[in-house]
């Protein structure tokens, strides 16, 4: 957890996301609560368009870029799957080019879903770290049109 994140930061993010992602239900799990001896709540982020909470972080990052006023022609990121889909979906919705670098052995379903959301997918490296390093190199070559998003 980043200790420099304030309540105001969380409230600003909630405002940015409002109307663009689903307000998913939060339900108490009595079974898990009994196991751990505390109240446990489950947030059903699987109901999001991309079926993942990662969509929230991707959209918040894109919205913050838009707020900055800096010209952004596209975004590039490294991801093994869920972040890629959220970024691709919201970049397309905002009219931005999205390039996602994924490890060569990323699950086919994640690669294809990312492409279906309009992103260009580059498969590179055996590990996430290798894909991330390639994304950094690619971003350095494409600047200033592409901004690296690293979540």
Regions found by a protein language model. Give the residues of each.
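PLP-dependent amino-acid enzyme catalytic core
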Residues: 1-151
């Amino acid at each position: 957890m980043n200790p420099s994140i304030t309540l105001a930061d969380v409230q600003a993010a909630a405002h940015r996301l409002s109307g663009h992602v689903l307000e998913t239900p939060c339900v108490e799990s009595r079974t898990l609560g009994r196991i751990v001896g505390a109240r446990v709540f489950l947030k059903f982020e699987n109901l999001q368009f991309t079926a993942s909470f990662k969509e929230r972080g991707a959209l918040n990052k894109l919205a913050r870029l838009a707020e900055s006023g800096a010209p952004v022609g596209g975004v590039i990121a490294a991801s093994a799957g869920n972040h890629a889909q959220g970024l691709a979906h919201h970049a397309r919705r905002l009219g931005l080019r999205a390039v996602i670098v994924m490890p060569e052995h990323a699950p086919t379903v994640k690669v294809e879903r990312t492409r279906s959301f309009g992103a260009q997918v580059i498969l590179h490296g055996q590990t996430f770290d290798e894909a991330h390093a390639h994304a950094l190199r690619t971003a350095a070559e494409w600047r200033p049109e592409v901004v690296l998003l690293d979540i």
